[in-house]
C-alpha cells in the first residue's frame, strides 16, 4: 500500500533570489534519491516560503522493488581446476558478490562458457530507506552559505526545524544539529509553532498559522489582490514578473495594499520614480487608464490586514525619503556642466590594471570613428558618434546615478538634452549600454549602435590585454555579455563588417594608455559567442562548418546557419554536401602557387566545371548563394567520374587540384562543407 511522504526544512530567512531555485533543487534531488533507491512514486509537489523548503511525495511505494542482477565471472576454463573443482578465481568471484559457489551456473557467450551468478536482493521497507534522505539535504548547493553558532558545517541559513512524515508517522532523523519531529513554525509574527498532523494536512496546518506554503498559491493571491485594487481604484498596476517573483519569496502570508505620495514628485523623471519604487522598495507602479504614472504604489505586506493603515503610512514614509533624494539630485544635477564632469573622469578608475574611465573613452572614440565609416554612416551621424564618444560616461559623476546606479545612461540622455546636446548624441549615451542583459533590447539608432559596439570592443580588448579573461563560468566583468551584445548588434543592423579584419585593425591602433594584446584569444572568444548565437537552431556540424569558413561577417554567418538548417531537410542536401566535401578534401593537396591552365584540360568535364566556377558569383541571400553552390553538384560529380584528379602526370594533377581549389575558395566563403555531417 502506497504512502505519502513530507519533508520540510525550517530555516532562518532566505534571500528571495534563492528560494525558488532551492525549492526546485530539493524536488529534483529527492526524485533522484527515490529512483536510485528503487522507491517508486506517483507525484512530487514542492513548497517554499522565505523560511522553509518542503516537498511532498504522493503514492510512495511501501518498500523498494526487489532487485535481481546477473553477474558475469571468469571463463569456465579458469573457473574449474584440473579436477573439476571451483578454482580460487571462481571462489573469489562469488565471495565478492556475497554468494557461494552453489550459485554458479555456466552460460555460453560467443562460443565460450563463462561463470554467471544471479543475485536476488529483497526490497527494504520505505521507512528504512528514507533514513537516508538527509543525504539529499546535505547535497543541496547554494550560491552563498554560512556558519552559525559553534558548528563546523555551513548551510544557506541556520536550520531550526526538520519535519519528516510518512503519512502521519514522524521518522527519526538527524540533520546538522537538528533532530526531526513534526513541529513546524508558523508566521513569524502572526503564527506560532504548530504540529504537522500528517503529510496530507501540511498546507492546512500551516495556513492556520498564517503561512501559505505553496508559492504558486501565494502568487495567485498577490495577483488577485492587485487586480481587486485596480478595479476599486480605477487604475492600472504594472505587475512586473521579476518583481512579482521576488515579492512572493519575501512573504508567507501576502496582503496587497495601495499607498500614495505627493503629486509634486511626478515632476521628477518617471525612470527615477519607477526605480525608487520597484528596485529599491519592491513596490508595484500604478498608472491611470491612459498609462500615465500616478502618485500611488502597490506593496505587499507579509501578514494580514490588521492595522493596515499604519503599514501604509510606514511604507509611504520610507518611499517619500527616496523620492526626496531623487528630487534633490534631479534639481542639483542640472546645475552641473558636462565638460566639468568629463574632465573629472580622468580621476575615475575603469580598472586598476587598465586605467581611467577617460582613457577608456578616448580609445572608444577612436574605435567608434572607424566603425562609423565601416557602417557607412552619414557625415551628420559620424559627427554625432564623435560627440557622444567624447562625453558618454559623464553621468556616472552625477548625484542621481551615484544614488541610483541603475539609471546610468538613462540620466545621461536626459541631462544631455537639458544641456543642449543633439538628440542623436543624447540617445546614443543611453543606448551604448544596450543590450544590458541576455536577450535584452538593442540600440535603435545607428549612432547608438556604433557607440555601443566601440565601447564593448574596447572593454573586451582591454580586459583580455591585461589577462583578465573569463574562465569556466567565472566572468566577473561580464565580457561574455558584452561580446554577445557585439554579435547581436552587428546582426540586427546587418552590418557586413568582417570581424577578423576589424579586430586586426584595432590591434594596429596605438594608444599611450594601453597596448592591445592576446588577439588570438579575443578572436576565439568572439567565435564562441557567434557559435552560441547559432546554437539556438543549428546543430554542431553546421556551426563548425560556418566557423571554419573563410569569412567572419556575423550577419552572413547567422543567415547561412539558418539556410543550411533548412537545406538539411531537403533531398538534394546529402549528395550536394558529399560532392563538395570530396572537392574540399582533395583541394587541401593543391599547390597554392599553381593557377588553372585551360590548355591542360583533357576532357569536357574539366572545361565545364572550370567555366561553372568562373561564373559563380554567389550573389543574393544566404539561401540563394547556397543554392548556387549546390546546383554545381552534378557538374562536380561528372568531373570526378571522368577525371583522374591525382594523375601520374604532375602538371595534370596540379592543374586539376587547382580547379578544385578555385571551387573551394569560393564555396568556403559560405561554409567549410567538408565539416558537414550527412549520415
Curated annotation (Swiss-Prot):
Catalytic activity annotation:
tRNA(Gly) + glycine + ATP = glycyl-tRNA(Gly) + AMP + diphosphate
Instruction: Give GO BP annotations, semicolon-separated.
Output: glycyl-tRNA aminoacylation
Pfam families according to UniProt: tRNA_synt_2f (PF02092)
Identify the keywords attached in UniProt to this record, alphabetized: Aminoacyl-tRNA synthetase, ATP-binding, Cytoplasm, Ligase, Nucleotide-binding, Protein biosynthesis
Q: Which domain of life is it from?
A: Bacteria
The subcellular location is:
Cytoplasm
Specify where it is mainly localized.
cytoplasm
* PROSITE patterns listed in its UniProt record: AA_TRNA_LIGASE_II_GLYAB
Protein family: Belongs to the class-II aminoacyl-tRNA synthetase family.
Q: Which PANTHER family match?
A: GLYCINE--TRNA LIGASE, CHLOROPLASTIC_MITOCHONDRIAL 2, GLYCYL-TRNA SYNTHETASE
Q: Which HAMAP family would you find in this protein's record?
A: Gly_tRNA_synth_beta
- Protein name per Swiss-Prot or TrEMBL: Glycine--tRNA ligase beta subunit
Whichever gene encodes this chain, its name is glyS
Amino acid at each position: 500500500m502506497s504512502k505519502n511522504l513530507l519533508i520540510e526544512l525550517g530555516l532562518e530567512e532566505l534571500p528571495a533570489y534563492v528560494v525558488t531555485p532551492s525549492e526546485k533543487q530539493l524536488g529534483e534531488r529527492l526524485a533522484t534519491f527515490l529512483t536510485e533507491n528503487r522507491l517508486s512514486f506517483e507525484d512530487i509537489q514542492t513548497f517554499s516560503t522565505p523560511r522553509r523548503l518542503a516537498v511532498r511525495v504522493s503514492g510512495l511505494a511501501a518498500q523498494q522493488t526487489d532487485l535481481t542482477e546477473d553477474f558475469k565471472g571468469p571463463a569456465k576454463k579458469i573457473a574449474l581446476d584440473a579436477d573439476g573443482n571451483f578454482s580460487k578465481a571462481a571462489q573469489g568471484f562469488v565471495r565478492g558478490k556475497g554468494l557461494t559457489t552453489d550459485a554458479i551456473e555456466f552460460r555460453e557467450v560467443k562460443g565460450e562458457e563463462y561463470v554467471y551468478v544471479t543475485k536476488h536482493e529483497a526490497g527494504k521497507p520505505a521507512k528504512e530507506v528514507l533514513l537516508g534522505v538527509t543525504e539529499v539535504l546535505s547535497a543541496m548547493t547554494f550560491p552563498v552559505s554560512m556558519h552559525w553558532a559553534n558548528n563546523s558545517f555551513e548551510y544557506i541559513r541556520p536550520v531550526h526545524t526538520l519535519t519528516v512524515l510518512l503519512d502521519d508517522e514522524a521518522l527519526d532523523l538527524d540533520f546538522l544539529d537538528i533532530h526531526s519531529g513534526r513541529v513546524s513554525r508558523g508566521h513569524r509574527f502572526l503564527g506560532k509553532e504548530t504540529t504537522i498532523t500528517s503529510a496530507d494536512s501540511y498546507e492546512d496546518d500551516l495556513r492556520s498559522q498564517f503561512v501559505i506554503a505553496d508559492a504558486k498559491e501565494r502568487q495567485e493571491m498577490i495577483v488577485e489582490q492587485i487586480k481587486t485594487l485596480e478595479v476599486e481604484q480605477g487604475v492600472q498596476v504594472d505587475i512586473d514578473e521579476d518583481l512579482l517573483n521576488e515579492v512572493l519569496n519575501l512573504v508567507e502570508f501576502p496582503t496587497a495594499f495601495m499607498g500614495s505620495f505627493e503629486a509634486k514628485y511626478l515632476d521628477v523623471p518617471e525612470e527615477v520614480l519607477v526605480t525608487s519604487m520597484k528596485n529599491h522598495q519592491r513596490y508595484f507602479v500604478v498608472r491611470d487608464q491612459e498609462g500615465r504614472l500616478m502618485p500611488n504604489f502597490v506593496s505587499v505586506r507579509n501578514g494580514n490586514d490588521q492595522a493596515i493603515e499604519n503599514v501604509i503610512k510606514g511604507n509611504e514614509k520610507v518611499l517619500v525619503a527616496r523620492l526626496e533624494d531623487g528630487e534633490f539630485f534631479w534639481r542639483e544635477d542640472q546645475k552641473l556642466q558636462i565638460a566639468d564632469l568629463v574632465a573629472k573622469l580622468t580621476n575615475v578608475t575603469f580598472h586598476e590594471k587598465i586605467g581611467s574611465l577617460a582613457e577608456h573613452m578616448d580609445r572608444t572614440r577612436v574605435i567608434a570613428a572607424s566603425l562609423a565609416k565601416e557602417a557607412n554612416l552619414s557625415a551628420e551621424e559620424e559627427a554625432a558618434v564623435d560627440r557622444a564618444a567624447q562625453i558618454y560616461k559623464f553621468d556616472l559623476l552625477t548625484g542621481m546615478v551615484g544614488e541610483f546606479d541603475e539609471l546610468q545612461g538613462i540620466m545621461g540622455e536626459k541631462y544631455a538634452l537639458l544641456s543642449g546636446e543633439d538628440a542623436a548624441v543624447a540617445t546614443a549615451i543611453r543606448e551604448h549600454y544596450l543590450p544590458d542583459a541576455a536577450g535584452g533590447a538593442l540600440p535603435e539608432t545607428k549612432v547608438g549602435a556604433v557607440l555601443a559596439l566601440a565601447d564593448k570592443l574596447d572593454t573586451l580588448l582591454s580586459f583580455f590585454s591585461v589577462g583578465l579573461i573569463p574562465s569556466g563560468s567565472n566572468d566577473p566583468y561580464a565580457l561574455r555579455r558584452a561580446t554577445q551584445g557585439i554579435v547581436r548588434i552587428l546582426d540586427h543592423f546587418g552590418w557586413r563588417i568582417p570581424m577578423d579584419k576589424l579586430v586586426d585593425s584595432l590591434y594596429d591602433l596605438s594608444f599611450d594608455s594601453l597596448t592591445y594584446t592576446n588577439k588570438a584569444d579575443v578572436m576565439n572568444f568572439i567565435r564562441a559567442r557567434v557559435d552560441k548565437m547559432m546554437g539556438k537552431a543549428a546543430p554542431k556540424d553546421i556551426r563548425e562548418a560556418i566557423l571554419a569558413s573563410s569569412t567572419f561577417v556575423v550577419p552572413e554567418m547567422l543567415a547561412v546557419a539558418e539556410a543550411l538548417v533548412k537545406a538539411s531537410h531537403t533531398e538534394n542536401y546529402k549528395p550536394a554536401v558529399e560532392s563538395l566535401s570530396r572537392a574540399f578534401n582533395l583541394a587541401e593537396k593543391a599547390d597554392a602557387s599553381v593557377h588553372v591552365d585551360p590548355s591542360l584540360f583533357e576532357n569536357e568535364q574539366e572545361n565545364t566545371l572550370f567555366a561553372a566556377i568562373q561564373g559563380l558569383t554567389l550573389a543574393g541571400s544566404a539561401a540563394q548563394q547556397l543554392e548556387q553552390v549546390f546546383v554545381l553538384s552534378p557538374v562536380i560529380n561528372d568531373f570526378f567520374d571522368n577525371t583522374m584528379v591525382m594523375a601520374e602526370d604532375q602538371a595534370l594533377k596540379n592543374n586539376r587540384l587547382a580547379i578544385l581549389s578555385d571551387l573551394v575558395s569560393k564555396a568556403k566563403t559560405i561554409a567549410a562543407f567538408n565539416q558537414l555531417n550527412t549520415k
